[in-house]
Swiss-Prot record:
Residues 461-583 form the HD domain. This is Bifunctional uridylyltransferase/uridylyl-removing enzyme. GO terms for molecular function: [protein-PII] uridylyltransferase activity; phosphoric diester hydrolase activity. Has four distinct domains: an N-terminal nucleotidyltransferase (NT) domain responsible for UTase activity, a central HD domain that encodes UR activity, and two C-terminal ACT domains that seem to have a role in glutamine sensing. NCBIfam families: PRK00275.1, UTase_glnD. Modifies, by uridylylation and deuridylylation, the PII regulatory protein GlnK, in response to the nitrogen status of the cell that GlnD senses through the glutamine level. Under low glutamine levels, catalyzes the conversion of the PII protein and UTP to PII-UMP and PPi, while under higher glutamine levels, GlnD hydrolyzes PII-UMP to PII and UMP (deuridylylation). Thus, controls uridylylation state and activity of the PII protein, and plays an important role in the regulation of nitrogen fixation and metabolism. Belongs to the GlnD family. PANTHER family: BIFUNCTIONAL URIDYLYLTRANSFERASE/URIDYLYL-REMOVING ENZYME, BIFUNCTIONAL URIDYLYLTRANSFERASE_URIDYLYL-REMOVING ENZYME. Residues 1-342 are annotated as: Uridylyltransferase. The keyword rRNA processing does not apply. It comes from Azotobacter vinelandii.
């Protein structure tokens, strides 16, 4: 810490200012403000970050000492002001906690009550927020014995004012000889770290990571130091080198990583104006600019900054894991000498952990760099890798070069890992953490820490990829068969499961380079397969899966699956039942690995429907597709059979059907048609809107709630309906709109409740929805079509210009309106209002919300039930949608019209 820094704080000048005024408060406030401005300016100039946070601690020392000395403590008073915790280490960020201990020899606090209260009141008045405790030596010992946080705080302390001997005595009464011996302290800190990591989903790769508490964050480094200090009296990171816990190169990496996180944390506090340790979306871009990152052709500045962040914390996590393992071996020694199990000439198991038989193993046999992970997969009961062996792995990564990658023995070992029945994900994750995976597959190395700046992809590309492989492995678990029945059944039947793991490894590997990542990944996958000498048929399947890994999800979510042509087109691209099985399983794992909240019962139902319809098409033969007329005939016959069995007059049903048109029978199942028909025939003509509600399937983890509305058509029908559903907290995922020749509308909406699930068997909720819709449709003029609700913070940050595409369908007499826009509360209601203003009729809609963006497709006609044909009308429609959905700060993006 500096002895004096007059630019930051000049004690003489400060004392002179105090003498000029009756109240000390203005002078203290001015000093605090000026110090913050000086330090912030130095930060923006790029000054050394360690010096900055130490300078701030020094400055606060001066302020506190001067404030303390304003009060009468008497010369021989046994009371001291002690800095503890991070402040005790001499580290302070702009809004870090200033933790103080007012320490007394005796237990009688009353003696010093008046000056203590005056001192703390002064700190409050000048705006210096501190965390304080007032304790005697005996109370310190008692509190420290009972509370891990207290003993940890007291281990790092400095005397700010008062006699130093009090702090030294406190150190004695709370020493490891008196309480919290190193073994107990280590076990408690290890459990504390596990609990903390679990709060952040055990990943370094959260979208808005906490630079202090997340895995690989500053707290992990501090935890190492606390344990080392308790056991060995270590005072700083570099001392761990001399004690044999870190190599000099590891210390250098850890110290530079710590300084990077300090810069990020300082910037966070400075920009947020508060103690903010979360890398919030709305600050990530600003920090990227502040730290000098710029956009490139392939990556945004914020993506480059966050990739650096993720790689730094991954490196910290790797090193802290190594040192933790080292601590465990030293502090918790097992019966190492008597529990050695040789595996081969290169490896043995000691006390449950894998290790090399001698330090030269990797140098003599480089293939052992891969063999170690194959052994771990074969022996899942092995608890991990010993610290010295982890270090040797890290030190010998350089041996993995092009010759190593081409060696048939090494390629065979890598493929063997994917054929393991257990431990594939766990050992790939280990390989990634130890830097082996990115070294063996340089293309994978490029995606390590690669984020995508959106809410759709909540993991970095490498974390997402490994999560996908974990999801594939979990599909073998019997307990997941209920949630993923079809995927669990299919993965058991796949002839070569290792091929889907390899496709999963490569499916997103082309991201971050610009261009089509599916095509880039397919090229990389082909090169991988050829280098690993995979059979031509296996290579063809892997490359096809990588190239088409988005095909099934985009078809299910964006196309009308009731259209036979959609199924035929998809089946033509798949062409083979085995390919369909692999693609379905990969798609399920991919969606769940992208963002678990994206997987809902409706998406599950859509994918099953697409799989089943395609399976039938492939069995029937692609040269014999079912025509529209044949499908309508079959659907009507099946529906009529159901109705006759329930006692409905077939003549009444067929008379009603003549008013509905072909699309109705293409877009509904026979059971739904029977359900609609029976209810309509029984509904009195003067009974107002008919609203039917039921589940789309009885499968527990699939489907959604289906709302069918039959009512006289009215101009604002869609706008009022979606606004009412918005007010009822329903999210619409699909809409099918039919208008009969008798001018009745038959609308079906597929909805999920606010929690992402279907309504289920909830009579009260069903009645609330039915009443709300009937009331809105009976009194449309009184119903607000636009509901103003607060936009969530994260959505606000991801504003972008809406994209509106208008084109006529080549196969059907409708216009396709595609909208990509930021998600906002009430968005569909706004679109419905625009349709109303432009006199458009909605025929069908596919609604998809992907993180912070919606990608909706609407099939519309004009007032005469014809496709849109007026370019000027389309241009005005396009502009109206873009203006209505645009964020206030975003521009209107030019979009395409093709009519």
């Amino acid at each position: 810490m500096p002895q004096v820094d007059p630019d930051l704080f000049d004690p003489g000048q400060f004392q002179a200012e105090l003498a000029l005024k009756s109240s000390p408060i203005p002078a203290y406030k001015k000093a605090l403000r000026c110090a913050r401005e000086v330090l912030d300016a130095r930060f923006q100039e790029g000054r050394d970050i360690r010096r900055l946070i130490e300078d701030r601690a020094w400055f606060v020392d001066q302020i506190l000492a001067l404030a303390w000395n304003r009060f009468d403590w008497s010369e021989d008073a046994d009371i001291a002001l002690i800095a503890v915790g991070g402040y005790g280490r001499g580290e302070l960020h702009p809004y870090s906690d200033i933790d103080l201990l007012i320490l007394m020899d005796g237990a009688d606090h009353e003696v010093f009550r008046e000056p203590i209260e005056g001192f703390l009141t002064l700190l409050w008045d000048i705006g210096l927020e501190v965390g304080q405790s007032v304790r005697s030596l005996a109370e310190c010992a008692e509190e420290a014995q009972a509370d891990l946080t207290v003993i940890t705080n007291l281990m790092e302390s400095r005397t700010i004012a008062g006699p130093e001997h009090l702090r030294q005595r406190m150190q004695e009464v709370t020493s490891a000889q008196r309480m919290w011996p190193s073994r107990a302290f280590f076990l408690a800190k290890r459990d504390e770290q596990k609990t903390r990591h679990a709060r952040y989903n055990d990943t370094e790769y959260n979208l808005e990571p906490n630079v202090k508490g997340s895995p690989g964050g500053l707290r992990d480094i501090q935890t190492l130091l606390w344990i080392a200090r308790r056991q060995f009296g270590t005072i700083n990171l570099h001392a761990m080198v001399g004690q044999g816990f870190l190599l000099e190169s590891e210390y250098t990496l850890l110290a530079s990583s710590q300084e990077f996180l300090w810069k990020v944390r300082y910037a966070l506090h400075m920009l947020a104006g508060r103690a903010e340790d979360r890398l919030l979306f709305d600050l990530q871009r600003q920090i990227a600019g502040l730290l000098g990152y710029e956009d490139s052709d392939a990556k945004l500045a914020v993506e480059r900054f966050m990739q650096k962040y993720y790689r730094v914390v991954l490196g910290i996590a790797e090193l802290t894991e190594l040192v933790f393992q080292h601590f465990e071996e030293v502090i918790l020694p097992g019966d190492a000498a008597g529990r050695v199990e040789p595996l081969n000439e290169r490896f043995q198991v000691r006390d449950g952990y894998l290790e090399v038989t001698h330090a030269g193993v990797f140098q003599e046999t480089p293939s052992a760099l891969l063999e170690i992970f194959v052994l771990l997969a074969r022996r899942p009961e092995i608890r991990g890798v010993r610290a010295d062996t982890i270090r040797l792995l890290r030190d010998h990564r350089y041996l993995i070069d092009d010759a190593f990658r081409r060696d048939p023995h090494n390629t065979g070992l890598f493929i063997e890992l994917f054929k393991s029945r257990q431990g594939i994900h766990r050992n790939l994750r280990r390989m990634n953490r130890y830097g082996i995976l990115g070294r063996y597959l340089p293309e994978f190395g490029h995606i390590v820490g690669q984020m995508q700046h959106d809410l759709f992809h909540i993991y970095t590309v490498d974390a997402h990829t490994l999560n996908l492989i974990k999801n594939l492995r979990k599909l073998f678990w019997p307990e997941l068969a209920e949630k993923y029945p079809l995927a669990s059944k299919l993965i058991e039947k796949l002839p070569k499961p290792e091929l889907i793991y390899l496709a999963g490894l490569y499916h997103d590997i082309g991201k971050g380079r610009g261009g089509d990542h599916s095509e880039l990944g397919a090229a990389d996958a082909l090169a991988f397969c050829q280098r690993h000498d995979l059979p031509a048929m296996d290579t063809q399947l892997i490359v096809w899966l990588v190239r088409n890994h988005l095909l099934m999800s985009t078809t299910a979510q964006r196309k009308d699956l009731s259209d036979p042509q959609v199924i035929f087109d998809f089946a033509q691209k798949v062409r083979d039942q085995t390919y369909l099985d692999y693609l379905y399983v990969l798609t399920v794992a991919d969606i769940n690995a992208t963002n678990p909240t994206l997987w809902n019962s409706w998406r599950a139902s859509l994918l099953r429907q697409l799989y089943t319809e395609t399976k039938h098409a492939l069995r029937r033969g692609l040269e014999q597709p079912v025509g529209r007329e044949e499908q309508i005939r079959q659907t009507q016959k099946a529906a009529l059979d159901i109705l006759v069995r329930s006692g409905t007059d077939p003549d009444d049903a067929e008379h009603l059907w003549t008013q509905l048109g072909d699309d109705y029978f293409l877009r509904h199942t026979s059971s739904d048609i029977a359900w609609h028909t029976e209810a309509i025939l029984q509904h009195p003509s003067s009974g107002g809107p008919l609203v039917l509600i039921k589940e789309t399937t009885q499968r527990e983890f699939e489907g959604a709630t289906q709302i069918f509305i039959y009512a006289p058509d009215q101009h604002d029908f869609f706008a009022v309906t979606v606004a009412a559903m918005d007010q009822l907290n329903l999210s619409i995922h699909d809409a099918r709109v039919i208008t009969s020749t008798s001018q009745f509308t038959l609308d079906t909406y597929i909805v999920l409740d606010a929690d992402g699930g279907s309504i289920g068997n909830n009579p009260a909720r069903i009645q609330e929805i039915r009443q709300g819709l009937v009331e809105a449709l009976r009194n449309p003029a009184d119903y607000p079509t636009i509901i103003q609700r607060r936009v969530p913070r994260q959505l606000k940050h991801f504003a972008f210009a809406p994209q509106v595409t208008i084109q006529n369908d080549a196969l059907r007499p409708v216009t396709i309106l595609e909208i990509i826009a930021p998600d906002r509360p009430g968005l569909l209601a706004r679109i419905g209002k625009i349709f109303l203003d432009f006199d458009l009729s909605l025929q069908n809609a596919k609604i998809a919300t992907l993180g912070e963006r919606v990608e909706d497709v609407f099939f519309v006609t004009d007032a005469h039930n014809q496709p849109l044909s007026d370019p000027e009308l389309c241009a005005r429609l396009q502009l109206a949608i873009a203006e209505q959905l645009a964020d206030g700060d975003s521009y209107i993006q030019p979009s395409r019209i093709s009519i």
